[in-house]
Amino acid sequence: MNNTQRIIVLDTETTGMNSVGPPYLNHRIIEIGAIEIINRRFTGKKFHTYIKPNRLIESDASKIHGITDDFLSDKPSFKDIAKDFFNYIKNSELIIHNASFDVGFINQEFSMLTKKIQDISNFCNIIDTLKIARKLFPGKKNTLDALCMRYKIKNSHRVLHGAILDAFLLGKLYLLMTSGQESIIFNKNIQNERNFRYIKKSITKKHRFLKIIKANKTELKLHNEYLKFLKEK
């Protein structure tokens, strides 16, 4: 894969899953979180939305992600965000953990709206990190939590599943799994996805060759003015 290729790391949350047949059958997506990586670095550009599913969330699913029917009552439907979402992911390397699950749901959502998009794999290259993990660690548990523990990524803040937070964790894991690097630790300021903040990377000895770019006086002034504006909101 070319490092300049636009990578999108994606995760979804749903109303639940079908126990017999396709997991997506009779269920809907309620949250999409996606984060962009270029040149093996997070760009800070993301796509994040909650979605009103027009059906009730199963109690077991709500226990996993903490999203409720009341919370989604005023959120957009998938048709309202479909165009922006498609434009965000098209022509990208789409990184997903257990991709068949999320892709099945996404394909169902698009197929309900248009015949032009029946399978997103026709518009982007899908990479399943679960398959990568199983090749690297055959016979071991390869859930997101298990991989975070294995690669020493601190995720104690991850009390509930959430698409945007899980996408960031998965992005870190993907970079580690494809670089041979053993561990990375990042700032504890990650909040629940509903209060998402861009996460600062810890600088380790392995990164000391990177050039540190400091803000100039004008940039610092603008930054301080922005912080003042936020406090006044």
Swiss-Prot record:
A divalent metal cation 1 binds at D11, E13, D166. It comes from the Bacteria. The active site is at H161 (proton acceptor). GO terms for cellular component: cytosol. It is an enzyme of class 2 (transferase). SMART domains: EXOIII (SM00479). The keyword Hydrolase applies. Substrate binds at D11, E13, D60, H65, D166. Gene3D superfamilies: Ribonuclease H-like superfamily/Ribonuclease H. The keyword DNA repair does not apply. Its EC number is 2.7.7.7. One of its GO terms (molecular function) is 3'-5' exonuclease activity. A divalent metal cation 2 binds at D11. It catalyses: DNA(n) + a 2'-deoxyribonucleoside 5'-triphosphate = DNA(n+1) + diphosphate. Binds 2 divalent metal cations. Magnesium or manganese. Its cofactor is Mg(2+); Mn(2+). Keywords: DNA replication, DNA-directed DNA polymerase, Exonuclease, Hydrolase, Magnesium, Manganese, Metal-binding, Nuclease, Nucleotidyltransferase, Transferase. GO terms for biological process: DNA replication proofreading. The DNA polymerase holoenzyme is a complex that contains 10 different types of subunits. These subunits are organized into 3 functionally essential subassemblies: the pol III core, the beta sliding clamp processivity factor and the clamp-loading complex. The pol III core (subunits alpha,epsilon and theta) contains the polymerase and the 3'-5' exonuclease proofreading activities. The polymerase is tethered to the template via the sliding clamp processivity factor. DNA polymerase III is a complex, multichain enzyme responsible for most of the replicative synthesis in bacteria. The epsilon subunit contain the editing function and is a proofreading 3'-5' exonuclease. This is DNA polymerase III subunit epsilon. The lineage of its organism: Bacteria, Pseudomonadati, Pseudomonadota, Gammaproteobacteria, Enterobacterales. The gene is dnaQ.
